Amino acid sequence: MNTKEYIFNQYKMYPKLELQDILKFIYQSSYGCEHLVSDYDEVKSRIEKEPINPSGSIEELDGDYIRLPLSYGLSASTLASLFIRSAKPSLNAKEKLEEKIHVLIDLISNSELPFSLEESKNILFKWKEDGYPAMHHSNTFNQLYHPSYRLIHKKFVPFLELFKYIDNNHPSIISIDGRCASGKTTLAHLLSE
C-alpha cells in the first residue's frame, strides 16, 4: 500500500476520526514510538494500568511500525520490552512525515477526505511551526474507538505468536532452527532478554 491507501484505510476503519487522528497516524508512521519511551518500569506500569479494548486488532502503519493492541495476549513485561526495543530514532523521519503531509493535503484539496482545506492548512502550518510535536487521539476518537495499543517495530511481528505462547504457558525450552538469515539470531537475542 502507499500513503494514500493507508490514510484511506484509517478513514474506513474509523469513519468519525478527526484530522488530528490522521496526523497522529502519519506521525507514528514516520517517527514510531521514539518520543514515548522513558524507562522500562514506567512503560510496563503504564501498560498494566491502561484499560484494554478487547476488540482491538493489529494495525499496520505507513512505515516500519504497527499498532499492537494490548488485548493481543502478551504480558506487560514482553510488550514493554518490544515497545522499548522499537523506540530507536527513525532515519529521515521528518522528511517522511512531510511527504505524508503532502499526500494528505492533496487528498483534502481533492475533496477525498471530509476536512476543510483552509482549516487543515492552518493546523498543519502551526504543527510545522511548533516542530511537529507528537499528537494525541482526538476526544471523539477516544470516546468512539477506545484505542488501546503500543507501537512496535514490524520486524517483531513474525515472533508475536511465539511470545504470546511463552507468556501464556509455562517457561519453555526452545530450539531455533531455520535457514541462513531467517531471523534465528534476532529471535534468540529477543528471547534471552
Residue ranges and their predicted role:
Residues 1-140:
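Long, basic/Gly/Ser/Thr-rich N-terminal segments
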Residues 187:
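Hydrophobic positions on the alpha1 helix immediately C-terminal to the Walker A/P-loop
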Residues 144-169:
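N-terminal pre-Walker A segment at the start of P-loop NTPase domains
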